[in-house]
Amino acid sequence: MSKQIKQNFNSGDLEKYRTALEYARKSKQSFQIVSTGLSRKIIMPNGYKLNYFGRKGAQNLVEGAFLVMMVRREIDAYIEKNGTPPQVEPTQVQTFNFTAIRKVLSGKRKPIVGVDINACYWFVAHKLGYISDTLFERGLNTKKKKGLLIAIGCLNKLPMIKTYQDGVCIDTSFDTAQHQMYSPFYWNIIYHTHQLMIDSFKVFGDDWYMFLTDCLFVSIDRMKDAQEFLKEKGFFYKNHTIEFKTFDAKNITWFDYKDMKIKTMYAGSRDIYFFEKVYDEKQRATEVAH
């Protein structure tokens, strides 16, 4: 049996990519470049793939980024066995309880606690069966939060492809087929988190202040209840305290005692009551359809 020849190479950071690109152009080579986020892949006519990732220097390299390809391989295995999950509409996982926040700022102040869900999207991907127990545990053991987030976030990337002929770019396109294959996994993970957000609001009501991606904010006297709620859902957590400062109908500002700094976020029309209403209407429509 002939030995398989390696064709995929990790070739360095983006600075090395720019050097390689400049050389390939000057030497009038023909090749393709696939770009997503901080990653670049140069595909040569002989099939060799030169992979580049991250900015120069160890401090700029996202720790745990190696999980991206591991997740992709397991998603490929899932597709081969089960197919692609149904596409769901993009949903919001950053919402606010405008009424409760205004009440706090009107003088009825009480401490607010953020209950951070550890590796939220990673846990959801595992709960949905998208990644194996082995990869799930390996990811957690890295203790690299950014790496876990990027590994899931990359499922929704739309790769850009540039085709070079004799060193000149002759075409730019997007790999919509790849995006259509992987993005449903990402949005199902987000939708499951959205459901968690809605469920938490139904439980905590006026003691629920906001939900930011993977953190539930409640009154301090409901902290243990929030922890138990998340524990029952299969999540782990850690806590930090915040204090709301202002709400001008567009932006909400608070002091974060974990990071010891002021934070501001655009609130717009992201009132949890609206999203609860939309969610309930969809649930009723689904029940009628069945």
Locate predicted features.
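Conserved acidic
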Residues: M1-H290
